A protein has these predicted regions:
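Catalytic active-site module of serine/aspartate enzymes centered on a nucleophile-bearing elbow/loop
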Residues: 213-229
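A conserved short beta-strand
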Residues: 92-104, 118-119
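Histidine-bearing beta->alpha loop at or near hydrolase active sites
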Residues: 201-205
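Alpha-helical scaffolding within the catalytic cores
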Residues: 4-9, 103-112, 177-185
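Short beta-strand/loop motif that positions the catalytic acidic residue
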Residues: 122-124
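Active-site-adjacent alpha-helix of alpha/beta-hydrolase-fold enzymes
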Residues: 126-193, 208-215
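Serine-hydrolase catalytic machinery in alpha/beta-hydrolase-like enzymes
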Residues: 1-72, 76, 81-89, 114, ...
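Short, proline-enriched alpha-helix->beta-strand connector loops that line the catalytic pocket
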Residues: 115-120, 190-194
Length: 229
């Protein structure tokens, strides 16, 4: 997926006045570009994409006079995994993340506890066969063992002690009638929240919207980031 062309973020930058960067990953031996988040078949790779993302962000902040405390990350699939990877670093520079079809690898995260409070938004299809909802702890798909969606959410919910929760049934996605459930966890202490958009019968894709036909998924993500600046 060419996220810069199809996600809808570019139009939003013009409307709301923020900067969107679309970094390209390194090409692997299979001819596919990737961000190095610890997949099994990239275990010999020395690519440091955390350093790359940090340096890219620092340059944009300096050159464009941006707010260094208002840096966010989103992406789909490997890009979603990279968003989690950035957020799970010992000293993350991102303020909030919004992965689509993302996950966290088991290796290195067995006892994961977030080091920085931030809000997290995940969009995930229940029938995703690439980044499986229930994960792949036995590494059947050869990506490397990774956690299921609910387990990933639990890292952040428990790490931030978010005790309040609710589930809201949203309107169907008009284009294909898929149903969406929004899971939300939060606290009365601050504005930290974790959102999970569960797309029933959803596949491995970037949905057009999340139940509001007039609001794109990109616009929902921007709204999430905007209120957590």
């Amino acid at each position: 997926m060419k996220i810069h062309a199809s996600s809808g973020f570019t139009a939003l930058t013009e409307e709301h006045g923020f900067v969107a960067a679309y970094p390209q990953g390194t090409m692997d031996a299979r001819g596919n570009t990737f961000f190095n988040v610890g997949y099994e078949f990239h275990k010999e790779s020395k690519v440091d994409d955390v350093k790359f993302a940090n340096e890219l962000t620092s340059k944009l902040v300096k050159d464009l006079a941006l707010d260094p405390d208002a840096v966010f990350s989103t992406g789909m699939s490997n890009g979603g995994d990279m968003s989690y990877f950035l957020a799970s670093q010992p000293d993350p520079f991102v303020r909030s993340i919004a992965p689509v079809a993302g996950t966290m690898m088991v290796s290195g995260n067995e006892s994961f506890v977030p080091k920085k409070r931030m809000s997290v938004m995940e969009v995930h299809g229940r029938d995703d066969t690439i980044t499986r909802w229930n994960g792949d702890l036995k590494n059947r798909d050869s990506w490397g063992a990774y956690y299921g969606t609910e387990a990933v959410m639990r890292f952040w919910i428990d790490g931030f002690s978010l005790k309040k929760s609710e589930i809201t049934r949203l309107k169907n996605i008009p284009s294909d009638r898929k149903q969406i459930q929004l899971h939300r966890w939060w606290t009365a202490i601050d504005d930290t929240e974790v959102l999970l958009y569960e797309i029933l019968k959803g596949k491995h894709s970037w949905p057009d919207n999340l139940g509001r036909q007039e609001v794109s998924t990109a616009a929902e993500i921007w709204s999430f980031f905007d209120r957590h600046r």
